[in-house]
Amino acid sequence: MAADSDDGAVSAPAASDGGVSKSTTSGEELVVQVPVVDVQSNNFKEMWPSLLLAIKTANFVAVDTELSGLGDRKSLLNQCIEERYKAVCHAARTRSILSLGLACFKRQPDKGEHSYLAQVFNLTLLCMEEYVIEPKSVQFLIQHGFNFNQQYAQGIPYHKGNDKGDESQSQSVRTLFLELIRARRPLVLHNGLIDLVFLYQNFYAHLPESLGTFTADLCEMFPAGIYDTKYAAEFHARFVASYLEYAFRKCERENGKQRAAGSPHLTLEFCNYPSSMRDHIDYRCCLPPATHRPHPTSICDNFSAYGWCPLGPQCPQSHDIDLIIDTDEAAAEDKRRRRRRREKRKRALLNLPGTQTSGEAKDGPPKKQVCGDSIKPEETEQEVAADETRNLPHSKQGNKNDLEMGIKAARPEIADRATSEVPGSQASPNPVPGDGLHRAGFDAFMTGYVMAYVEVSQGPQPCSSGPWLPECHNKVYLSGKAVPLTVAKSQFSRSSKAHNQKMKLTWGSS
């Protein structure tokens, strides 16, 4: 629980708090432990004030969900976005949210330009209406530590669709979502279209029939903007891959380099929770990259490209995210060296000054790989694997179709946040970054971290009345598309009736 002071502010953690990122005199970063507060029916009322305080004082809130399934994968990748929206709506009406992750990031300007206090919550939920749960979803979630016995015994109950009477003053998940809207904070997600649709149907109101009406509603619900870290990672940070674990670890590493160089960098602090809350807090480790890592025989091409492997923990190849990023960076550096050598030879042959020859691009991240029609429908939920923009070595390219067929046959609906390892309680004594990280609360933290780092990497923002990070403002990633979904209210779209009624309730009772 966040420590509440008399004036309603969140108290800062002590300087010696184990959750604070620190550096030794030798420059080696200590292990960072991220506290994730578990919220269930048995402590929901106790945590309610802290949840509200964290949301209201945050500068932005990152959200993630675990779902009971998604239904027909092919429809979810329909080239017609309107039809795709209808397919996601059908899934949201027939499936449920099993857990909700919230990560609230509050700026601490007195501690640095890019310093945040992060509070992370993992809410276990239980829909009280009939819903579909898919076997592959169950298998995947159990493999990554989801406790279904605990969910059915202690999940916070909720109902979907429209309100049943005046619920605005009750302590419920639906009211918590209403408080998130009232806070008028930027909402951050990763590959967030599915999350947005499920959040609306499960905690807000019945979904509108058209995508235009849905985006018009969203525009009014979140006036500070909706941000998608997959869009930011792929189109602005230009990472080689953009699945969540890769983007998070890449940002961590780049941030560490900037800190070591004395450049502007992101710093985080976490609340120093009392020992009485120990049973409700799950600490997740963020390890610094190993400088001398034993290299296995090979990296798993599937996991490297898509963030998911059908063999899971039984895969004999490496799923080490740091090793994958090391390999990508080495390949990119080799490519730059070869490009410079070609330029030098061409200049020598043409006897030209050192200007860049035509056809040679500037140094930068590896060129994006366009997947187009080769996308397989099973490669989706919060991530569609074929959308991952890897610049694979030749050996990977040759096996790409086989990998995709393997995914089509065996992949569960959740991929973007999937990791290859067993839950933390069964992890090896020498964990690899990413080991057992898959959880709505920690995924929300990773999502928020990526967005905070993108802010740092873009440099000082001009003082204006415009939106935060305008390049990413109200742009939601669309799998298989070169352009994002823009969240805006067009002159041809009206807000839905259910939304208008909800808005009156929201602001009339605030």
UniProtKB/Swiss-Prot annotation:
Pfam families: CAF1 (PF04857), zf-CCCH (PF00642)
InterPro entries: CAF1_poly(A)_ribonucleases, RNase_CAF1, RNaseH-like_sf, RNaseH_sf, Znf_CCCH
Start-end of Basic residues biased regions: 336-348
Cellular component, GO annotation: Cajal body; cytoplasm; nuclear body; nuclear speck; nucleolus; nucleoplasm
Residues modified as Phosphoserine: 5, 358, 428
Keywords, ordered alphabetically: Acetylation, Disease variant, Metal-binding, Neurodegeneration, Nucleus, Phosphoprotein, Zinc, Zinc-finger
SUPFAM superfamilies named in the record: Ribonuclease H-like
Tissue: Widely expressed.
Zinc fingers, C3H1-type class: 294-322
Positions of modified residues (N-acetylalanine): 2
Places the protein is found: Nucleus, Nucleolus; Nucleus speckle
One GO MF term: poly(A)-specific ribonuclease activity
Motif (Nuclear localization signal): 335-347
Quaternary structure and partners: Interacts with U1, U2, U4, U5 and U6 snRNAs.
Protein name: Target of EGR1 protein 1
Naturally occurring in which organism (per UniProt): Homo sapiens (Human)
Gene this chain is encoded by: TOE1
